[in-house]
Amino acid sequence: MRLKYLKLKNFRGYRDGEITFSDLTAFVVKNDSGKSTILEALDVFFNDSKGVIKYDKEDMNITCGVDDVVISVGFDDLPNEIIIDATNKTTLADEYLLTKDGDLEIVKKFRNGSTTPKVYIYADHPQNPSCCDLLTKKSSDLKKIVKALNLEDVDLTRNAEMRQAIWNHYRDDLNLSESYVDISKEDAKKYWDKISNYLPIYSLFQADRKNSDNDSEVQD
């Protein structure tokens, strides 16, 4: 996957900002304009405060009047397929986990001063109450829905296939809309566990301190 953009809300000096990236990106601005904040926000996102930068509740922009800090990162050049359930292959598009532009946007929200984020995917996802939460359903729950809808020729051993069959049943009434899909809870957490394996490796080297081969970012 390739880093495409970063969105910051209520993080330090950024109330609501977006930065786009290309194969080579350089920031040329005067001092104290927020260059380091961008790089450090990426470190918090990719390394979960286990890298150089540790997220602190004081990173919240207190002038915004809200308690949530949001770091969102968008990616393109996505894997052709992913395996979520055992050996069951699927795609991010088939699971309605992409934006309208076809990007994967992962969102980490630090709520009410918490230093542990909740993880979401901002995607063009079904809003129909009958099929809006299939990603959180266990296999047994999906089977019940398939049987209740009298869907035929569906492999009941494959969660992805059952989800596709249910969504296809409601294909004319999915009510697609870009929304936050919570992948921090229940079975949806498996998506984050798998998707995180495809994320780029991000290492931040700070020029204003001594760097050595023993640093964790070098050893990793």
Predicted features and spans:
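A general secondary-structure signal for short beta-strands and their flanking turns/coil
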Residues: 1, 14, 66-70, 99-105, ...
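Pre-Walker A-like glycine/lysine-rich segment at the N-terminus of P-loop NTPase domains
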Residues: 1-47, 56-66
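Beta-strand secondary-structure signal
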Residues: 5-7, 18, 70-74, 105-107
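Intrinsically disordered, low-complexity acidic/polar segments
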Residues: 17, 28, 80-82, 115-117, ...
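Beta-strand elements of well-folded, non-transmembrane domains
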Residues: 25, 75-79, 110-114
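Conserved P-loop NTP-binding catalytic core
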Residues: 40-102
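Electropositive, glycine-dotted interaction segments
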Residues: 88-220
